[in-house]
Amino acid sequence: MEYLLILLVSLVAFFLKGVTGTGTTTVIVALGSLFIDPKLTIVLASFINIFGGLSMVRIDPVPLSVRYWLPISLLMVVGSVAGAMALNVVPNQQFQLILGGAFLLTALWFLFRVPSSLGTRKPPTVAGVMDLGVGTVAGFCGGFIGINAPPLVLHFSRYLDKRRLRRLLILIFIPAAMAQTATFAANGLFDHQVMIWGLFMLPAMFVGVWLGNRTFHHISESMFRRTLGLLLIFVSIRLVLKGISSLAI
């Protein structure tokens, strides 16, 4: 039963990634934490995200300046390593509370944010200070609580259209996922069971990416955000209550 649920989680997560370029970790951690140790879901999400990102590199390769996305990606790696190291020292009960609170904020953001229209504005050619800062913070959040999309999408969607935003997210998530996985392995969190789960997710991952990419130009991203937001509200409340009950014992 556990492996069937993992396949379904993988399909949903990578369908969302195929459409938006992000959301994979959020879905895997949100749904996976219902039947897997919450910490291990973040390790699993980082591992499978390496393959998910690589599978999308050649999908809709709109041009983005290397001087723009590479510095952001490198600082995401730095933040990811710091976040993954922090994950190893935070007690599990506190982690559940932190994760639940973060999900609740993320859910509200997904529900109420309205994307702006960018028209034909050209993308930047060089990363600015704010771009680098947001990349670092997002990397830390991804390594620590498994959520890095909200700060990235909130910031970069102000001046990147749908296609270029998806492209940026695909490119910068791959090195960050590799760094997180390597750090988890060094800290002893990446074990044999996580590897088995990740490899088992691969077939559903490819199907999800394929389906998501096919619907990229035909489905509303705002509907996805609202649906995911409602789901995350339920999961976040459950995690917060579970963390509180664990502290009370």
Question: Can you say where each PLM-predicted feature lies in the sequence?
Answer:
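Glycine/small-residue-rich loop that forms an oxyanion/phosphate-binding "nest" at active or ligand-binding sites
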Residues: L64-F110
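Membrane-interface helix termini and inter-helical loops of multi-pass transporters
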Residues: A84-Q94, L118-T120, F184-I196, G243-I249
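Interfacial loop-to-transmembrane junctions
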Residues: W210-F234
